[in-house]
Amino acid sequence: HAYGAFVGTRTLSRNVEDVYGSFRFEDTIEDFSAFKIKKVKEKNNAIEFEFEEGGKGKIEIATNIVRLQFESASVETNRLAMSFVCEDTDHFFGLGAQVSAEHRGYRIPIWVSEQGNGKSMQGEPPQVFGLTGAHYDSYSPIPFTLMNRPLGLELDTPHRSEFEFCVDEGPIRLEIQDSTFVLNIYLGS
């Protein structure tokens, strides 16, 4: 299942279509598997944990920031994700140079792509791939969202990632297409 506290999978195949800097990804992936925590310990002012399936993670807490990272033991696992409860009042802003100001109810890919000549509506594909842009194509995507709770969520990665915000009344879901997941949570007041 793609939704869970700690989940991972691997990409079986990837087809990337590129037209003048516009990208379209078609991935075939295995089903996501949940990682279950088996051991937790405090070490050097951090909380470290290990998964039953292998792999490990760490939570570090500093003033106004929580850094959470985890990795799978399998070298084949190259997609990791986390899900969080989405409150009815949650709103999501940011993610770099985006057309929309508020992103609740959408999946937003974080990948540099030519925006095209014109944009499609939220949730709709571009009318002519490579000429018109998908709604969330961006020359400057930034893997950081500011919420109204107040919280900031930053995926600390150079890899392709995705933010999913309460799609179909579902959870907040963050995915990094890499073998290491690093999330910085900024706490406001």
Can you name each region flagged by the protein language model?
Residues 1-189:
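Catalytic and substrate-binding clefts that recognize carbohydrates or anionic sugar/phosphate headgroups
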